[in-house]
Amino acid sequence: MAKAPVLTPRADDFPRWYQDLINKAELADNGPVRGTMVIRPYGYGLWERMQQEMDARIKETGTQNAYFPLLIPQSYLTKEADHVEGFAPELAVVTHGGGKELEEPAVVRPTSEMIINDYFSKWVQSYRDLPLLINQWANVVRWELRPRLFLRTTEFLWQEGHTAHATYEEARDFAAHIHRHVYADFMENVLAMDVVLGRKTAKERFAGAVNTLTLEGMMGDGKALQMGTSHELGQNFARAFHTQYLSKEGKQELVWQTSWGSTTRMIGALVMMHGDDNGLRVPPRLAQTQVVVLAIKGDEAVLAKVRETGDRLKAAGLRVQVDDRTDVPFGRRAVDWELKGVPVRVEVGPRDLENGTAMVARRIPGGKEPVALDALAALLPTALEEDQALLLRQARERRASRTSDVSTIEEAVEAAAGGGWARIPWATLGERGEAELAEHAASVRCLVAEDGSVPGADDAPGNVAVVARAY
């Protein structure tokens, strides 16, 4: 009798496969309150690596980290009408504290534009105080009616950047820099994710923004996932909070602002873009464990060689874990590491010891081959870089093969329903066509210029709408 698969095959039931993988790879579990989640150590380790890589890129822009309160006075949300209207259905409101009803209810932050702008208005007085560049790593709460681990949860972790500038051009350019040189660079070069950079339509724009730049990725089932956004806020929040500065000419001027964010949703994207029927495939540059060295048997000589090999690979600059457990069968351990997507397994048994070799299993391309133990430290860094490039290439090939250029709304709907993306001239689709797409569970993920670059305006000549079903 054939052995039952560990995971539901993706082709049979993609949502079930996703939930199976989250569970079996020990990434997360459901929390006790609907829509919340417990991020398990392996899943949180991925988030920590994302934080490390992102934080370094954010700080290169001159942005500094800070932290603002979780609770926001409800009155703050009335100061920017579009913003509060956009978030009203998702708000969690605290009405009691210390056993008493609060004089003013407090909102659990859905995002921090309001409270951060209150402090910006105090901190910015002169042109010398600009630009003001702040980021925070935090949790936010947006009440979710249809939760799915990592993709849509009531509470999630993220980073949110907030900046104030003296001119429109400076703010616009900073938002674009975050979009391309922080987010896209991280997603392509660390996560090995193929992303489309574009601008949101007015319908999809962030509440209170004048322009939203987005990064959209195609998942394994052809649906789109928004991976991160960078917003030009214009002077909307500055006007609401009277955030002004004294210019060099001695005039009081309103600041120009941006905000931008990315979340633990990227872990869900990692699963759906790179995972296969055997589990996760973690990009080597991201992986908290790039190489796991396993003992096939609990022989003392084998265990000693496994530990020695682990030390040599660590000395070569690799992130290594030694699995020398003797109370768990080797086959079970190998399957567990495959599920977790560790890029390379180095397996050592008594026969390997005699031959001076190890069996090397590469998770991303698949397959095993014997490699001399003495050659591992020299060969594995190159193999890991090859596998990093392979993941990105596979993601790009998937999108290219499942994206079609169309000329009618009907063709766009058909492409999205079939698990693909469609590119249609925005002049053909327009806002009326965008509304029609919604009736078929599809949406405009972003607008791109004819050459694939980010357009400077929604109605720029030649703009193309990227249409898909989305998470």
Swiss-Prot record:
UniProt keywords, alphabetically: Aminoacyl-tRNA synthetase, ATP-binding, Cytoplasm, Ligase, Nucleotide-binding, Protein biosynthesis
GO MF terms, alphabetically ordered: ATP binding; proline-tRNA ligase activity
Gene3D superfamilies: Anticodon-binding domain, Bira Bifunctional Protein, Domain 2
Enzyme class (EC, first level): ligase
SUPFAM superfamilies tied to this protein: Class II aaRS ABD-related (SSF52954), Class II aaRS and biotin synthetases (SSF55681)
InterPro entries linked: aa-tRNA-synt_IIb, aa-tRNA-synth_II, aa-tRNA-synth_II/BPL/LPL, Anticodon-bd, Anticodon-bd_dom_sf, Pro-tRNA-ligase_IIa, Pro-tRNA-ligase_IIa_arc-type, Pro-tRNA_ligase_II_C
CDD domains membership: ProRS_core_arch_euk
Catalytic reaction(s) noted: tRNA(Pro) + L-proline + ATP = L-prolyl-tRNA(Pro) + AMP + diphosphate
Record's GO cellular component terms: aminoacyl-tRNA synthetase multienzyme complex; cytoplasm
Gene Ontology BP term (one): prolyl-tRNA aminoacylation
Cell compartments where the protein resides: Cytoplasm
EC number: 6.1.1.15
Domain notes: Consists of three domains: the N-terminal catalytic domain, the anticodon-binding domain and the C-terminal extension.
Function, in words: Catalyzes the attachment of proline to tRNA(Pro) in a two-step reaction: proline is first activated by ATP to form Pro-AMP and then transferred to the acceptor end of tRNA(Pro).
Quaternary assembly: Homodimer.
Similarity section: Belongs to the class-II aminoacyl-tRNA synthetase family. ProS type 3 subfamily.
Name the UniProt record assigns to this protein: Proline--tRNA ligase 2
Gene behind this protein: proS2
